Amino acid sequence: MLIKLLTKVFGSRNDRTLRRMRKAVNVINAMEPEMEKLSDDELKAKTAEFRARLEKGETVESLIPEAFAVVREASKRVFGMRHFDVQLLGGMVLNDRCIAEMRTGEGKTLTATLPAYLNALSGKGVHVVTVNDYLAQRDAENNRPLFEFLGMTVGINLPGMPAPAKRAAYAADITYGTNNEFGFDYLRDNMAFSPEERVQRKLHYALVDEVDSILIDEARTPLIISGPAEDSSEMYKKVNKIIPHLIRQEKEDSDTFQGEGHFSVDEKSRQVNLTERGLVLIEELLVKEGIMDEGESLYSPANIMLMHHVTAALRAHALFTRDVDYIVKDGEVIIVDEHTGRTMQGRRWSDGLHQAVEAKEGVEIQNENQTLASITFQNYFRLYEKLAGMTGTADTEAFEFRSIYRLDTVVVPTNRPMIRKDMPDLVYMSEAEKIQAIIEDIKECTARNQPVLVGTISIEKSELVSNELTKAGIKHNVLNAKFHANEAAIVAQAGYPGAVTIATNMAGRGTDIVLGGSWQAEVAALENPTPEQIEEIKAAWQVRHDQVLAAGGLHIIGTERHESRRIDNQLRGRSGRQGDAGSSRFYLSMEDALMRIFASDRVSGMMRKLGMKPGEAIEHPWVTKAIANAQRKVESRNFDIRKQLLEYDDVANDQRRAIYAQRNELLDVSDVSETINSIREDVFKVTIDAYIPPQSLEEMWDIPGLQERLKNDFDLDMPIAEWLDKEPELHEETLRERILTHAIEVYKRKEEIVGAEMMRHFEKGVMLQTLDSLWKEHLAAMDYLRQGIHLRGYAQKDPKQEYKRESFSMFAAMLESLKYEVVSTLSKVQVRMPEEVEELEQQRRMEAERLAQMQQLSHQDDDTAAAAALAAQTGDRKVGRNDPCPCGSGKKYKQCHGRLQ
């Protein structure tokens, strides 16, 4: 109560921020007459003037009023569009390292031109990040004339572009692209084998469009570049045959359950667990199928991989539903993004889940993958010196933006007042009653020529509503992952009088639904439209526009509540743009996932007390409040998951930054001989210490063991025992020096054969290749550690602290292994002629190229809307170390083309 009173008196933090910025808006408005007097050339010359002022020491912030006034004037001349005052406010918020919440239709794309221009003046580059390739291309092409008028270059970063084109895009002042592509380019740059292969510059300023989708919805999914691991597709097929024999337990509480269930499903945490009865049955079935020996336990250490297959198959059958979580198209399982409803071509679930779903659907099972490099969006975007974002729905997630990204959220007022009517939710007992009520609502709207947008949370639901509308004889369009190719056309005409559009969450984010339909789309459909035709189309559109306004504007129907209030608000936000009329209503049933899992008992108890009859709906503030509480519960749980993921990933992130910094230093130098000499000393010291402990008696020395180790690991034949016999005066220190001196002499003789330049080149290649190989293994080890670390909680230990401690030990061990492997490899290389070194270098390059190919996406989709573990694959079968070499020599691969020496 007191807080509300103080807010009324002094204003909220948001009000105070906007009040401060409005003073700057007044200054910009005062400059407008002065800017209007400038010729085009004088206006263009302002860019060079601003850059010169920055070089002399002025700050970017000091240029805001003048730079914004220049962009506004340029926009008037190039587009015929003048930035509203609220757009100037939005531009200042974005420059201030904040999230700008701007409602749908308020011109976020035009607003972004202000901070993009201002921050590009420094010459360090600006990245404008969008959720899909279509929006990146559209926004870049739309804004290009304005930026080029002001002397700025614009680049577009798209998947599948060759490296030179990408480098050119990144070298531009302003680069448009998707969050995925920026992230993958960062990972690929840190797998490059020469500085010329890198494409990105230093990460300076990122302006993220639909920031809630990218930094929150996708924060739990890391970007992963992976290569093929061993083939185990047959095992997935065998285990898949067993799963249909298992019965799902009716209740999750197995202690009180007396029925016949073999596994329980926890829908909240999306986990499946075998019951005691289920374990006994599955062991019997595995023995019967010849997969496991009689008397063995599924939980024995020898069967860990088998347990992994069983768990993956159970999850595939019990938790993942066709046309909800994925679709099957052209014999391929394609993931559907739960937040946007878009297909995510080329993406694959990790931990064998994708293979288990492929086995379930009877399509070809593709190989599992091994992580080569990974990063979360949370950690990628925190690498930028300056980060800002904009969206129509951010205020509900303001706490998360602040605590994780240190970004404040500022709600920018609308240019015109919002007059959309948001009606209370209607709750029905059953799904069938709810669908019937939705159909009746649509009939009423179409009867008065009011356009309707029906929002669903899955493809399955959108098709269910579509079938009912077809039965009722109502014409409609369906916009979901199966028909996304027509997205732009469907969204463009969704505001037509009486139009009915069913959409999953993809609902054309980034594309406005114009009341009366889009006259621009009609003009674009004509080959060579005359001015008369354009005027005719505009006049017809005006009639339709007025007709729709009279009918009440666009009506939004939500078929169920999403887990997040923000995504419900996004659906509502499709209506009521720029002060237009509109309305919205959500229809719910007790069978909806959210109600069933989080709110069922309380709400269904209320409904029973009210004595509801079939077909009746409840519309009460208590129910709306209970649903909002259920959504808050889910949002809070999801926030905790994202926060926990970040805390664990922060540990890996510190290591990633250290490795990538070391790798980039390596790439940028041509001579690593000093480093090699230094680590050679360290490696030989550790090796000798293992057999000749420091300050020990001669009786404690293991000379035969040391000689064998030097021979096996460093290819050094040293008669150490002979030296000691012939020279009794040799003591521990002089012996160490002699071993190291001998090793250096042997290495120098190799260098004399091939030449110093070639050897330096080869040393660098070996260091890079060894670093990449060990980092890849370290990532896999960190994954395994992460999966089991929660069990330390049972021993009264903090899992996070244990993870930090163990991962640090593993990282330190990896760095020691790196030194050892590099020195060992370089010592064992047998060279007689320069040509042989060239051949070895060629082999290393071929391996690097193979990895580079694996990083390319196997499929591209312009509409892909961001992260999930992406496995970039190659069609080639991986050659095992002990397989015959493909060259036909008859030798094992490891002894032929798989060797380094």
Swiss-Prot record:
Chain sites annotated for binding Zn(2+):
C885, C887, C896, H897
Name a GO molecular-function annotation.
Answer: protein-exporting ATPase activity
Q: Where does ATP bind?
A: Q87, G105, E106, G107, K108, T109, D512
* Catalytic reaction(s) noted: ATP + H2O + cellular proteinSide 1 = ADP + phosphate + cellular proteinSide 2
Sorted alphabetically, which keywords does the UniProt record give? ATP-binding, Cell inner membrane, Cell membrane, Cytoplasm, Membrane, Metal-binding, Nucleotide-binding, Protein transport, Translocase, Translocation, Transport, Zinc
Cellular compartments annotated: Cell inner membrane; Cytoplasm
One short Pfam name that applies is: SecA_DEAD
> How many cofactor units bind, and how?
May bind 1 zinc ion per subunit.
Q: Which cofactor does it need?
A: Zn(2+)
Xref: InterPro entries: Helicase_ATP-bd, P-loop_NTPase, SEC_C_motif, SecA, SecA_CS, SecA_DEAD, SecA_motor_DEAD, SecA_preprotein_X-link_dom
Query: Mind telling me which SUPFAM superfamilies this protein's record contains?
Result: Helical scaffold and wing domains of SecA, P-loop containing nucleoside triphosphate hydrolases, Pre-protein crosslinking domain of SecA
Q: Which GO terms describe its cellular component?
A: cell envelope Sec protein transport complex; cytosol; plasma membrane
Q: Which NCBIfam families match?
A: PRK12904.1, secA
Q: Which family does it belong to?
A: Belongs to the SecA family.
Identification of the protein by name: Protein translocase subunit SecA
Query: Which organism was this protein described from?
Result: Escherichia fergusonii (strain ATCC 35469 / DSM 13698 / CCUG 18766 / IAM 14443 / JCM 21226 / LMG 7866 / NBRC 102419 / NCTC 12128 / CDC 0568-73)
